[in-house]
Curated annotation (Swiss-Prot):
Optimum pH is 8. GO terms for cellular component: peroxisomal matrix; peroxisome. This is Peroxisomal coenzyme A diphosphatase NUDT7. Its EC number is 3.6.1.-, 3.6.1.77. Changing residue 66 to M: No significant effect on Km for CoA. It comes from Mus musculus.
Length: 236
């Protein structure tokens, strides 16, 4: 498991504070929490190291029946013990990679995502403690790795797939990332890549090197309109 190197605390704090301020401007809070009983949450984990921001990803265990080997964020279905979307994301992250709640600061909730037409996924964005060391649960997680946040605006290897839903075209972003330390190649796509691009757009406030279906001048409202349209067509 590769991990980015550290940086002086004042620099790290400034980097994190700037990112937090931008994320909070895009926070939808609990605005859509009432919409479905079939609820899921994912934790979108950020880490500041070496003067840069990174996203942490997991590779699903080959033992899993659904999507084995896929790259994703920690997360899963809400349990009766979960009080809210954040509780689900934190519980799943602890089960999957050994992340305790005190090791992450939750900053914002992004616009939900309609997954497989019958599940409502809430992205919960948080900053990891800079000393956090992942301890993957082998039954659920095969690997943990980090990717620089700016890779999701200026990638080295990238392609798109076109998806059509009810007459509307959408872009699936596909990123191939080679870990510089291990040489392992990862494919990041689907909902996971969509969220990574959105977080990069919010925090870095830069135009990407590829076509997107977000409105850069009206980012969160445009995401909300797309979500509500998809929700209206779903089984939720």
């Amino acid at each position: 498991m590769s991990r980015p190197c550290g940086l002086p605390e004042p620099v790290r704090n400034n980097l994190i504070d700037d990112a937090k301020a931008r994320l909070r401007k895009s926070d939808v809070g609990t605005r859509y929490s009432h919409l479905s009983s079939n609820k899921f949450s994912v934790l979108v984990p950020l880490l500041a190291r070496g003067g840069k921001l990174y996203l942490m990803f997991t590779v699903r265990s080959d033992k899993l029946k659904r999507e084995p080997g896929e790259v994703c964020f920690p997360g899963g279905k809400r349990d009766p013990v979960d009080t809210d979307d954040t509780a689900t994301a934190l519980r799943e992250a602890q089960e999957e990679v050994g992340l305790h709640p005190h090791q992450v600061e939750v900053v914002s909730h992004l616009v939900p995502y309609v997954f497989d037409n019958d599940a409502l996924v809430t992205p919960v964005v948080g900053f990891l403690d800079h000393n956090f060391q992942a301890q993957p649960n082998a039954d659920e997680v095969k690997e943990v790795f980090f990717v620089p946040l700016d890779y999701f605006l200026h990638p080295q290897v990238y392609y798109q797939k076109q998806i059509t839903q009810s007459g509307r075209d959408f872009i699936m972003h596909c990123f191939e990332y080679k870990d510089p330390e291990t040489g392992v190649n990862y494919l990041i796509q689907g909902m996971t890549s969509k969220l990574a691009v959105l977080v990069a757009l919010i925090i870095l406030e830069q135009s990407p090197a590829f076509k997107i279906d977000f409105d850069l001048h009206d980012l969160i409202p445009s995401c909300e309109r797309t979500f509500l349209w998809r929700y209206s067509l779903s089984k939720l």
